[in-house]
C-alpha cells in the first residue's frame, strides 16, 4: 500500500456465494484491498443498506464457512489483500483461535472485528500475532490522542478512520471535521490510515486522499448496486464502473497532494 488504494467492501453471500466471487473478481482490477463482510444477524455498526444485505445472505442459509470457501476460490486467481470484517459474537462462538486459523488457511490477510474494543482485545491480538494474521481497529473523530496512538500501534494493516459519527451509508459530502480528523491522524499515526463510512463518489475519494488518507473504504455504494441488479452481468458492469470512478478519484487526490 505505497500509493493510496480503494478498499472495496462486499457482504459475502449477497445474494449468493457464486455471485460474491464474481463481484470480488470484478472489483479486484481497481481495488488495492478487498474487505469481505461476514453476514451477522445484529450488525449494529452498519446502516440499512448493509443490514439488508446481511439479511439477504442469511435468509439464503449463508454460513461463516462459506465465506472461507469463497476466499479460497478467489485466492486461486488473485493475491490482492483480503480483510474479513465481522462482529465479535461469531468469532467468540467459533473460538478465537479456531476462527483465526480458518481465516488464515482460507487466505485472509487481516481481520476487522467491529465491536471489539481495543482494551478487550489482548487475547485476540496475541492469537492473531501467533498466526501472522493482520489486525485492523477503528477510530472515530472524537477518539482521544492517546487512544488513537494505541489503535494505530495495534493495527498491522491499516487504521480504519470512521469519517463521521453514526452508522455506515452513503452521504452527499464530508464535513470539515472529517478532514481535520485525517490531518490529526496523519500527524499521530505511524501506520496506514484508511477512511470509511459514506464514500460513494470519485469526488469523495479525491478529497479524502488529498487530505492525507492512504485509502478509502467503500461499502454501501457497492452493496446498493447488488441490491438493485442482483446476480447479473449488469451488476458486474456497474460495480466495475463505480470502482473505476473511485480509483480515478484516488489518483487525482494523490496528484493534488503531491503538487
Swiss-Prot record:
GO terms for molecular function: tryptophan synthase activity. It holds the Pfam family Trp_syntA. Its EC number is 4.2.1.20. It catalyses: (1S,2R)-1-C-(indol-3-yl)glycerol 3-phosphate + L-serine = D-glyceraldehyde 3-phosphate + L-tryptophan + H2O. GO terms for cellular component: cytosol. Keywords: Amino-acid biosynthesis, Aromatic amino acid biosynthesis, Lyase, Tryptophan biosynthesis. Signal peptide: none annotated. Pathway: Amino-acid biosynthesis; L-tryptophan biosynthesis; L-tryptophan from chorismate: step 5/5. The active site is at 35 (proton acceptor), 46 (proton acceptor). SUPFAM superfamilies: Ribulose-phoshate binding barrel. Belongs to the TrpA family. Tetramer of two alpha and two beta chains. The alpha subunit is responsible for the aldol cleavage of indoleglycerol phosphate to indole and glyceraldehyde 3-phosphate. This is Tryptophan synthase alpha chain. It comes from Methanococcus vannielii (strain ATCC 35089 / DSM 1224 / JCM 13029 / OCM 148 / SB). The gene is trpA.
Amino acid at each position: 500500500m505505497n500509493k493510496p488504494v480503494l478498499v472495496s467492501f462486499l457482504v459475502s453471500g449477497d445474494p449468493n456465494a457464486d455471485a460474491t466471487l464474481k463481484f470480488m473478481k470484478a472489483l479486484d482490477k481497481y481495488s488495492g484491498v478487498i474487505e469481505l463482510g461476514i453476514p451477522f444477524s445484529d450488525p449494529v455498526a452498519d446502516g440499512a443498506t448493509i443490514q439488508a444485505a446481511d439479511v439477504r445472505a442469511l435468509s439464503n442459509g449463508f454460513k461463516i464457512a462459506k465465506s472461507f470457501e469463497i476466499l479460497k476460490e478467489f485466492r486461486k486467481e488473485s493475491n490482492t489483500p483480503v480483510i474479513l470484517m465481522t462482529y465479535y459474537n461469531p468469532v467468540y462462538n467459533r473460538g478465537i483461535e479456531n476462527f483465526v486459523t480458518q481465516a488464515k488457511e482460507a487466505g485472509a490477510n487481516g481481520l476487522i472485528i467491529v465491536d471489539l474494543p481495543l482494551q478487550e482485545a489482548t487475547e485476540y491480538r496475541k492469537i492473531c500475532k501467533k498466526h501472522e494474521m493482520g489486525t485492523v481497529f477503528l477510530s472515530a473523530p472524537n477518539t482521544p490522542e492517546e487512544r488513537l496512538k494505541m489503535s494505530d500501534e495495534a493495527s498491522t494493516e491499516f487504521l480504519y478512520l470512521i469519517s463521521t459519527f453514526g452508522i455506515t451509508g452513503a452521504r452527499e459530502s464530508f464535513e470539515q471535521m472529517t478532514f481535520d480528523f485525517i490531518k490529526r491522524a496523519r500527524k499521530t499515526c505511524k501506520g496506514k490510515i484508511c477512511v470509511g463510512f459514506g464514500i460513494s463518489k470519485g469526488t469523495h475519494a479525491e478529497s479524502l486522499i488529498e487530505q492525507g488518507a492512504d485509502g478509502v473504504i467503500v461499502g454501501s455504494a457497492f452493496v446498493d448496486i447488488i441490491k438493485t441488479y442482483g446476480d447479473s452481468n449488469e451488476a458486474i458492469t456497474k460495480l466495475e464502473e463505480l470502482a473505476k470512478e473511485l480509483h480515478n478519484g484516488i489518483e487525482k487526490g494523490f496528484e493534488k497532494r503531491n503538487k
